[in-house]
Amino acid sequence: MKIKSLLLLSLLIVTTNCENIEKKSDQIDGLLVHSVYFWLNNPDNGQERAEFEKAIKKLIKTNKLALKKHLGKPGNTEKREVVENSYDYCMILTFPSLRAQRLYQDAPTHLIFIDEAKHLWKKVQVFDSMTESI
């Protein structure tokens, strides 16, 4: 009887933990998702692209306020009217709070990045969104 009870309890614990892991993985970490799209002045200039990548990677690596970080280029997805893929780079950062995102805006690493790289882009578009429960 003890063995059956232990097995049943173990199964219950494993099942509960799996459900919790599954629920956690459904949603992005962070209250605020900060999505930034960059259009470079000279996207075909390898030297300028390398300079931009060096600056933005330094920003991402030295930023201690973001929970999750992503740097990417347009995906090679199906061309459709609703798909915007004219940008050169996308950076996504998630923050635990509005305060953390505000601190990031004024952080020396962010300001240094802007100063070092602003001459390399012709357009920047930012989309900030607050996480909703799903």
Task: Name what the model sees in each region.
Residues 102-105, 115-117, 121:
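Short, exposed beta-strand-loop hairpins at the edges of beta-sheets
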